[in-house]
Every structure is written in structure tokens, then in C-alpha cells.
Amino acid sequence: MYGHAVSAAGSSAVTGQPLLEQIFTIQRRVKGLRSAQQSKWYRGSIIQAFVFAGFCRDESFFLFNFRPLLLTAQKGVFIMNSLVILLIAAAALLGGYLLYGRFLAGTWGIDPKAKTPAYLHEDGKDYVPSSKLTVFAHQFSSIAGAGPVQGPILAAVFGWVPVLLWLLVGGVFFGAVQDFGALYASVKNDGKSIGMIIEKYIGKKGRRFFSLFCWLFTLLVIAAFTSMVSSTFNGFTAAEDGTAALNYNGAAAATISMLFIAAAMIFGLLQKRFSMKEGVKAVAAIALLAVMFALGMKLPWYLTASQWNFVVMAYLFAASVMPMWLLMQPRDYLTTFMLLGMILGAFFGVLFAHPDMNLNAFNGFAVTSASGSISYLFPTLFVTIACGAVSGFHSLVSSGTSSKTIRNEKDMLFVGYGAMVLETLLGVLSLIIVGAVAVNGNVPDGLTPFQIFSAGVAGFLESFGVPNSAANVFMTMCVSALALTSLDSVARIGRMSFQELFAYEGEGEAPFWQKLFTNKYFATVVTLALGYVLCLGGYQNVWALFGAANQMLAALVLISIAVFLKATGRKHAMLYFPMTVMLLVTFTAIILNVVGNVKAFAAGTGTFLVNGMQLIVACFLIVLGVLVAVTCIRKLVSTVAGKAEA
């Protein structure tokens, strides 16, 4: 079936070993990269066209170790140095922010003197004026979910070149534009969600279709990410003899996460009670992280993945209904320091070890998995890598929560565009890590992307003197935090989308059923319950559909932003290309998903929980996607450019 080849393709020397031994093999390989790279003389020829290497007697200095920094040729095969990829990516992303990001801000118009929705509608719950760093922390930790780790590693079966190109082009010209555009449109429209903006500029019918689409999409996110988190927190793993063995890393990371939630609430209360400067807040946050980390390592909490499903759902309920300042904002603020530590660990690990990209550069336009299923570069690559390139979910965060806390319009570029390019950098680091541990040009088989990424970065941290147990627990905690911080945001957004879907628009008192459906507690329970049912099939069976729906959402949001920009007399032509590409990609992907599920039932291998649920959701997404796209495009064509209130 469509998408399965991506997760199954690839083989390696570590295949066949017990799970923990495979992880330790990767860690030993990464840990030894630095010393191996510094002492090894390459007998392959240096490509003269890339004279970039330096030489120095001190071989310990990472840039000067008698090593060509761009390409080496071994047995006629050219291998790229990961340091060059990292430097090119960093330069491209920084250039995109400084040049294209500022161009968009200047073209659309920023008014630093305007009162933002956070002040106009301040209520202490959703509308809360916050500092630039606090809003950035919320935006980044919410959007930097499992995607920038999961997507590039799964898509690496096509080769590192197409993955890198899509990350950079998508991140700068697709994803960051959408994130910033959604934040901009929402702030200019009283902090309204994309659905309500569609109602204002396109019509109520378009808003209803879009709200339903968004709600269905949040169910997929809840299902996929809950399954990932519960699997990561699983306190048990299969031993070689088939019995259950204790998984300390997962159990300790789970305890830290639970303590982390309590610490976030304490931190939120302290922020509410005392006016802390940014420096004091940062020190307090890092101190709390250290205490929670130390306690969690001493008190591992052993539960099964099924039990963790219920714990995660209980947390999501609380996060969905509590005031922003009490849980989500402080949690995201604390999480950002941890994620930045992870990114810096990976960044400096690549900087000092600069391993070769052992992945093949390009494996062709079609790859075949071990089971014989085929995945095509188009559209698979573009829906497998969502977060890190372009993700419709980001627009829901931008317009659903971040826009209500921006205290100055000039912060929007840093929050919207800046958070996205940082996430793209995380995607590039994920690609480099899987490239470093690849064997014979292929992705290590038998391990999840999270396990590959965690083991790789933990190996880098060990080479810097961090104890093995601490490095592994820290990375397990980080990758679970990636999914958890997106989960709490999407649970809140899903609840709000459900409420918008049944919002009362008549005069007088709303009927009882409508009051019930717009009640935040009822809406949260319904959303989480259906998300839980979908997660029972495992994230592997939801991911392909999630990616396609995510990208379709991005296409619909880009069209909606274009309508808003045109209606308000702002330039919008720069959105035509990305929205057209995403429409082609997503409809192709979802149609292929439907075909694959139908074939599974025809062959007698399909099950209702997996294939049946996917088929139902996919058909709904196609119908709703067509309705929203047609409605928005008609309005875009018919709208006369003018100057509206916003």
C-alpha cells in the first residue's frame, strides 16, 4: 500500500540483532566518528573543483584534520561530508529569513504601533500578551513535533539529495511563508482562526467545510503522536528469549515528563505572580529542568504502552481546557530550552565529527521495500516530509494560539518565519544523523526514526563526556517532548475547531444540543475519544494519511491567505506556486492511499481498524478538500483587489 515502502525499505548490518543491541551499535558507531575521522587519511582522490580543505598540525581541530571537507572519492563513489551539508543548510535558512522573510514583512506591512488582539481582547485565558521569546517558545515547541525527525529519516530511502532539497526549498518558500502568513492574517483579524478568516473573506459555507476538515485532521495528529509518545514511554521491551524486559530509558523519560508537567504549572503560577525578567526566567527554567531530570532518572515509572495511552489522553484533556498561561505556555517555554539543547548537541556533534553521508545520494524515482511494495518519489517524498518543509498544522498553531499572545506586530516575523526555519534545521540534522549511521547506502532497518535519531545524538553527547545513561534518557525525553508539545496544542485546536463547527449563529438563546456541542469539556472529550480509537492501529498506519492531510491543509491555508491578501490590497502572487504544488501533491497522495486500501480489502488482507478507518477518513478528506479548494479558488478569482478593514 502507498506509503508502506517508505517505512520498510532499506537494510543494514544491524538488522537481525536484538533491538537494544541495534541501538548500542548505532551509538558506538556515532561515538567513534570523531576519533575515526580525525585519524583517518583518505586514500581516495580529492575533487579538485572543490578546494575547500585546510591543513594544520593540530589534528584535533575539527576544520583542519588533513581531510577534504566537501567530497571524497572511495572506489569511484563520491561521498559528501555532512559538515558541508550543515553549513549550506544553515546559510540557506538564515538567508531565507533575512532576505525573503523580511521581504514578505515589508511587502505586506507591519505596524509596530498597532494594538494586537492580545491587548484588545485580553482575558487571561487565550488572549494573553506575552514576550517575543515566550511566544516563539510556544510556536517552536508546538510545531517541532515528531515530523522533522520522523519525516526526513523515513524519506531517506530516496537518497539524501532529494530530502535535503525539499527541506530547504520547502522550508524557506513554502512552510515559513505559510506559518508567517497565517500568523499575520490572524493578528490583522483580531486573532481569529483560519476558519473564521475564511468566513469573513470567503463565506460561511467555506468556514464550515474548513472547520470540519481541520477537526478530522486533528484526530489524525492525536492518533499518530499519542501512539509515538506511548511507545517511547513504554517501560517494557522484548528480550532475546521473548520475555518482557524493563526499559529504563523509556520509564525514566516518562517520569521526567510527568514531573515536567507539574513543574510547568508551578512555573506558570510564578510568572503570573511575579514579573520576571527574561534572564531570570531562563535561569529558573534551566534549574527546574535540571531538578526534574535528576528526579526522573532516580524514579523510573514502568507502565505499558497501552496504559500510557490513557495517561496521555488525561494530560491532553487538562491541556485543552486549562488557561494558556497555566500549563501550555510555561511547558512550551521550558521545553524549548531542552529542545535547543538537543539541537545544539546534534549541531556541534556534526561540527566536530563531521561524518560522511553514507546514504546514497539518489535511489531513483521509485524504491521497493523488502515486502515488494513500491513508493514513488512523487508524491511520497512531499507528504512524508511535512514538518520541516511545510505543514498545515503549523497554520493552526499560528492562528489558533500564537496570534492571541503576540504583543507587537514586529514580533510576527521572528515567531512565524523564524520558528519554521529552525524546525527545518532540525530536519536537516535528522537527515545527517541517519546518513552517518547508514550502512551500504541504506537506512538502518528494524529501528524507528526516533530510535535512530536518539541513538545518534546520544552518541554525539557521549563523545563530549556525557554519561551513557544520562545521554540516552535525555534524548528519549527530547523526542517524546517533540510529540507531546504538538499534542497538547493540537488537542486544544481540535476542541476549538469542533466548537466552531457547531457555533450558534441565530438570534436568541441557542438550543440545548448546540450548547452541549460548543461546551469546551464536551468538545474535548469527543475529540480525544475519536483520536484514541484511531491510535489503536499504531502510528505507522496513520502516518501516510496524516502526511497527505497535513499537506492538503497547507494548500487550503495558502489559498485562504491569498484571498485575504488580495481582498486587503496586498501582494499575494508569491503564494500561487506553493499552493498549486501542494494541491497536486496532496490529492495524488490521498487518492493513492484510497486505492491501496481498496486493494488490501480486495486481496483479503485489509482490516477495518486499519484499512477501513483509513479509507473512511481519506474519502472524507478528499470530499472536504475539493469543496474547500473550489470555494476558496472561486473567491480568489472573483475577488477584486481592494482595501479592507484589516
Residue ranges with predicted function:
Residues 146-153, 170-178, 182, 186-190, ...:
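Membrane-helix boundary/coupling elements in multi-pass transport proteins
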